[in-house]
Amino acid sequence: MKKIFTLIILAMAVVTAAQAQTITINKTDGTKVTYDASEVSSIDFAPKSDTTTIHSFTGYLLVSSAYFQNMYYGDAAQMSVLAVGDKYLCRFDDATWGHGLFNITLDKGTISGTGSVTMVNPQGGASTTHDATMSGTMTHITISIPDLMGGTTINWNYGDPRAYKTAGTYSAKDNIVVGGVADYSYSTNDSVDYTVVAVNDSTINLVVPEESFDNLAMMGNLVMGTYTISNIAWDAAENAYVRSYGSDGITFDCTIAGKKGHYEFTNSDCKVVVRPNADG
């Protein structure tokens, strides 16, 4: 009788141990998923995917919406074209503008398709997904999202975003030298704002503001009106944007001691050099 009782106790222990058994799956990202053995009927491994990455490029973004135009959003956005069997997908990834996947058609260097873009809420809320379309070439792709901020267009570009990094408004006091003599150098009364506008990857415009200088020798007060120097191209040898503009027909208003006149830059020495610093 004692042996039978012992066997019953052992059998119950084995059953309890079996019921408590778990299966732990260790994922490649360091996390774990644990299941009770009773929850698993079988484990099947799916066949290897036939997805192939054809192209993957990193480029810069210019984004427009109902609230802003052509705003530069860095140069780390990635576009990847994937072949899945006989179909093609394009994957978009950017830290600010989210992640998108599109079913696309490739035709003689052009790309077009439909899909969606999922964006993380910068305020910490839930992410949102938006229907979107894609079109362009392998170096310039446009993603259109109609229901985001009154209509949002994300332009992805493969190339050097140097001009867009340089674009912006720069504030400081300016100096003028009268007659080419260093002793007759004067600063503006207040800080002024110079504006650099990107035309394309390697060309900028420079908007020079109205500037006021007081008590110039033999001239009195001087006010120079605003003007724009256009199409200043990147010069690799100078490591700067350079343009001689004496023959561009640029005019400006100038008031000297209360007398206003209209003038044109015609001197062959008229030259502008815009040299970006390390961060653009």
Q: What kind of region is each of these model predictions?
A:
Residues 50-57, 75-77, 106, 133, ...:
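Edge beta-strand at a domain terminus
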Residues 29-31, 40:
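Short, small/polar-rich motifs associated with maturation and membrane association
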Residues 4-14:
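Sec-dependent N-terminal signal peptides
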Residues 66-134, 178-270:
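Predominantly extracellular/secreted and cell-surface proteins with exposed
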Residues 17-22:
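Boundary at the C-terminal end of the N-terminal hydrophobic targeting segment
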Residues 23-29:
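C-terminal trimerization/auto-chaperone modules of long, extracellular attachment fibers and adhesins
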Residues 36-45:
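Structured surface patches comprising rigid loops and adjacent beta-strands/short helices at the edges
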